[in-house]
Amino acid sequence: MSIKSDKWMRRMVEQYGMIEPYEPGQVRYDAAGHKIVSYGTSSYGYDVRCADEFKIFTNVHSTVVDPKNFDEKSFVDIKSDVCIIPPNSFALARTVEYFRIPRSILTVCLGKSTYARCGIIVNVTPLEPEWEGHVTLEFSNTTPLPAKIYANEGVAQMLFFESDEICETSYRDRGGKYQGQRGVTLPRT
């Protein structure tokens, strides 16, 4: 299994629309010239952006968090350029980018150091072969203070690994429950 390069990513975008929208370089400044958390293509990865749709966890109903029976009322929905995550809490968001993962590829997501160094952890499960959709992002605020996430700026890096052989059954083949997801997607069973 080998990691894929910037040249490979560009080719996959051109041939298969693997990442939409796609930024061929690293963007470090917004249109007004202000510094931002970078996004776009790096040597061996792609830095994704967070969209402006957030679900912030709240426990006002004092319910138990149950992945098999998740209560949608546990979240407050906001649409904003920033998201303030309460201390020791979390928020869900989605990528700006829509992904179409090739059958021979497994994609792993890692948080950006800019956020990690502030106690904000990004968690995403692997993107499996032939999965497609917006990626749902989970941000954990591990600090005792409110934490800020910026929409339309870099939040995590996707790494693409190619297998030595094609998988027998892809995510699409088995009818994965998150196939084609758009927007922030809550747990499904």
From Swiss-Prot:
Gene Ontology molecular function, alphabetical: dCTP deaminase activity; nucleotide binding
Pathway entry: Pyrimidine metabolism; dUMP biosynthesis; dUMP from dCTP (dUTP route): step 1/2
UniProt record, GO biological process: dUMP biosynthetic process; dUTP biosynthetic process; nucleobase-containing small molecule interconversion
EC nos: 3.5.4.13
InterPro entries per the UniProt record, alphabetical: dCTP_deaminase (IPR011962), dUTPase-like_sf (IPR036157), dUTPase_trimeric (IPR033704)
Keyword vocabulary terms for this entry: Hydrolase, Nucleotide metabolism, Nucleotide-binding
Catalytic activity field: dCTP + H2O + H(+) = dUTP + NH4(+)
Active site positions: 138
Protein's UniProt keywords contain Hydrolase: yes
Presence of the UniProt keyword Nucleotide-binding in the record: yes
Residues reported to bind dCTP: 112-117, 136-138, 157, 171, 181
Family matches, as CDD domains: trimeric_dUTPase
UniProt xrefs under Pfam families: DCD
Record's function text: Catalyzes the deamination of dCTP to dUTP.
HAMAP family tied to this protein: dCTP_deaminase
Subunit-structure text: Homotrimer.
NCBIfam families: dCTP_deam (TIGR02274)
Family to which this protein belongs: Belongs to the dCTP deaminase family.
Protein's recorded name: dCTP deaminase
Species assigned in the record: Cellvibrio japonicus (strain Ueda107)
Gene name as annotated: dcd
